[in-house]
């Protein structure tokens, strides 16, 4: 089997970087870092501040703010949440979405009104009201969340474009020309997210200031390329997966976020507004796997100037349900009101040290493997003369080596089935708890079509586990 990854950068450009010996610069590109925080948010805001992150992503739910009619507003919970963020010197990315009953065109598939396509002419005026109220405090507005998942939006791409994105973007820019439109916030699950992004950019790319998406896939082990038996973070980010057997294509995944952006000539920055990994507090292996996943996300981000913001999912394990995506656990008896997982201390180290995040140290003392050679900081990385040295060495250009490069060719045996599993939610395998990998999923045998369908179902189940609670 050969797993061919379609690259966006030319081999000549990559070779030029290697020959020049230039490292992939990241300090010159400031990066934004934050957490998703839900409405019962005090602990989440505190954890975000304590991690040294500068942003929170909140849900400004339409059905809460305008529950009864177009004429009645209730801003109470959002005023408190936004003011709480500002009091902690945090910036806010507000997700404006979810349909109230009075604005629903129809409940096409059952399950309530919140994921319904809104009636024409209803969403834009609400976005105008949001921006007018908060533009002195909030400058970034994301238009809906994961509209390609039925849980959050029942419509087709054209419904999203016509009823949500275009009227919403026009409303933001009209009410606040300096404010930023972020979107479409697609989940990288299944085979259609690339098509969704293709349609949105084809119809309205000029209205987007920041392209956003969500990736929960894991990272392949060093030396294995960007994934052979399952989809990887790299394939969803920038280089989609094609599986060939004997020179015959047997599977092709969705185009990645960056490939679709390049197809449309989009030069707006990319923000990953959800990514993360579950970890049960007190389980050392899971906490370490979560820490490693966070580390890998930031290392990859710092080698890609076009990717300028990451919002992790999420700040804290919100009671009473057993959600474990957070980096802290609510505990009123603990100092600060929470108990921290390992990822929090790691983020404190990175944000206080790495210049791209406003830190005051260097690559050799920032907690990251900046040159992607498997060694972190002085003295482990022998290319660092001291902890104060400026550079760990040269990172492979994107799409090469351990930075998402093609995997070694394999010709023997049948192809492994493609997996579309939300790897961030899978329990860690024992061998995947060290720095070699961020998350692991077990591969299953079977025909490609059958397993692909099962994989999508599993991915949706895991996505719903993240989000089946009041946001």
Regions found by a protein language model. Give the residues of each.
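C-terminal low-complexity, Ser/Thr- and acidic/Pro-rich disordered "stalk" regions positioned immediately N-terminal
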Residues: 394-442
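Boundary/entry segment of secreted carbohydrate-active catalytic domains
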Residues: 27-61
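Noncatalytic carbohydrate-binding groove/subsite architecture in carbohydrate-active enzymes
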Residues: 124, 158-288, 337
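Extracellular calcium-associated, cysteine-rich motifs in secreted modular proteins
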Residues: 356-405, 409
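A cross-kingdom C-terminal cell-surface attachment/processing module
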Residues: 449-469
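Substrate-binding cleft and catalytic face of glycoside hydrolase catalytic domains
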Residues: 47, 51-195, 218-221
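Aromatic-rich peripheral "rim/lid" segments of glycoside hydrolase catalytic domains that contact
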Residues: 133, 147, 282, 289-296, ...
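Bacterial N-terminal signal peptides
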Residues: 10-21, 455-461
């Amino acid at each position: 089997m050969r797993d061919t990854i379609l690259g966006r950068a030319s081999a000549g450009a990559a070779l030029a970087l290697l020959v020049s010996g230039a490292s992939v610069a990241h300090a010159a590109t400031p990066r934004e870092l934050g957490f998703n925080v839900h409405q019962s948010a005090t602990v989440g805001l505190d954890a975000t501040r304590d991690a040294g992150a500068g942003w929170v992503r909140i849900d400004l739910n339409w059905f809460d703010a305008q529950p009864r009619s177009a004429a009645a507003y209730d801003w109470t919970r959002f005023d408190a949440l936004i003011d709480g963020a500002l009091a902690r010197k945090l910036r806010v990315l507000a997700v404006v979405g979810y349909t109230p009953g009075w604005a629903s065109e129809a409940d096409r598939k059952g399950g309530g009104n919140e994921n319904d396509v809104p009636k024409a002419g209803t969403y834009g005026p609400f976005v105008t009201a949001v921006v007018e109220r908060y533009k002195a405090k909030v400058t970034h507005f994301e238009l809906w969340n994961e509209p390609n998942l039925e849980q959050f939006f029942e419509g087709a791409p054209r419904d999203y474009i016509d009823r949500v994105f275009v009227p919403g973007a026009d409303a933001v820019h009209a009410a606040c020309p300096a404010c930023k439109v972020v979107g479409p916030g697609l989940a990288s699950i299944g085979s259609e997210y690339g098509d969704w992004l293709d349609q949105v950019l084809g119809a309205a790319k000029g209205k987007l200031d920041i392209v956003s998406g969500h990736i929960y896939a894991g990272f392949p082990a060093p030396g294995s390329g960007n994934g052979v038996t399952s989809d990887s973070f790299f394939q969803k980010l920038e280089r989609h997966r094609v599986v060939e057997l004997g020179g015959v294509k047997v599977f092709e995944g969705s185009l990645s976020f960056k490939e679709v952006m390049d197809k449309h000539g989009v030069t707006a920055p990319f923000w990953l507004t959800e990514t993360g990994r579950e970890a049960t507090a007190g389980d050392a292996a899971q906490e370490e796997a979560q820490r490693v996943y966070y580390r890998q996300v930031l290392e990859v981000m710092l080698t890609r100037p076009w990717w300028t913001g990451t919002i992790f999912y999420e700040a804290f394990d919100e009671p009473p349900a057993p959600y474990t995506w957070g980096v802290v656990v609510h505990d009123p008896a603990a100092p600060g009101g929470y108990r921290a997982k390992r990822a929090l201390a790691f983020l404190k180290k990175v944000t206080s040290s790495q210049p791209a995040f406003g830190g005051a140290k260097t690559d050799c003392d920032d907690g990251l493997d900046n040159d992607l050679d498997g060694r972190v900081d002085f003295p482990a990385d022998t290319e660092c003369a001291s902890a104060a040295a400026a550079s760990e060495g040269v990172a492979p250009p994107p799409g090469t080596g351990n930075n998402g490069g093609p995997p070694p060719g394999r010709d023997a045996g049948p192809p492994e089935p493609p997996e579309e599993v939300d790897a961030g939610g899978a329990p860690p395998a024992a061998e995947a708890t060290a720095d070699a990998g961020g998350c692991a999923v077990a591969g299953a045998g079977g025909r490609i079509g059958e397993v692909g369908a099962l994989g999508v179902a599993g991915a949706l189940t895991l996505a719903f586990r993240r989000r089946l609670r009041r946001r």
